[in-house]
Amino acid sequence: MNDADTNLGSSFSDDTHSVFEFPELDLSDEWMDDDLVSAVSGMNQSYGYQTSDVAGALFSGSSSCFSHPESPSTKTYVAATATASADNQNKKEKKKIKGRVAFKTRSEVEVLDDGFKWRKYGKKMVKNSPHPRNYYKCSVDGCPVKKRVERDRDDPSFVITTYEGSHNHSSMN
């Protein structure tokens, strides 16, 4: 690492802008709360912004804090980071709007009949639990509801079902 790279890093960390804010952890459509996901999305996606527009908006009038001219790769990184940060803010706002309800039920079967049809889209092992978590989406086109089902860590005779969102249609029964 040369002195220019070191100065660039310290200039960013001393600035009041949070340029080094990283995107939230995310796995495609899955919603995770309590476990660490190893995939980071957002940095490889195109957000529809021109790199020069975003970099110019971020640094207009403040370029004097740099001791060297910005390279194109620096502008690209800053623009990608800024747009990823803005995208994550939108995800946080959407998450607040959705309702989340959890039920703990004693059951031999994992998927209980709740009056809706579900499509399984994922399964993963959860930290500190010997039982996998299963992910489902409502099978009606355009319905945003998701649910996850897992056995209780402490008492496997219980199933924890968590619903996120509200159905935009009536039940199937």
From Swiss-Prot:
Record bears the keyword rRNA processing: no
Domain of life (superkingdom): Eukaryota
Keywords, ordered alphabetically: DNA-binding, Nucleus, Transcription, Transcription regulation
Principal place of residence: nucleus
UniProt xrefs under Pfam families: WRKY
InterPro entries: WRKY_dom, WRKY_dom_sf, WRKY_plant
UniProt-annotated location(s): Nucleus
SMART domains membership: WRKY
Keyword DNA-binding: yes
Gene3D superfamilies reported for this sequence: WRKY domain
Gene Ontology molecular functions: DNA-binding transcription factor activity; sequence-specific DNA binding
Residues of the DNA-binding region: 107-172
GO terms of biological process kind: defense response to fungus; jasmonic acid mediated signaling pathway
GO cellular component: nucleus
Similarity comment: Belongs to the WRKY group II-c family.
Function: Transcription factor. Interacts specifically with the W box (5'-(T)TGAC[CT]-3'), a frequently occurring elicitor-responsive cis-acting element.
Protein name per UniProt: Probable WRKY transcription factor 50
Taxonomy of the source species: Eukaryota, Viridiplantae, Streptophyta, Embryophyta, Tracheophyta
UniProt gene name: WRKY50
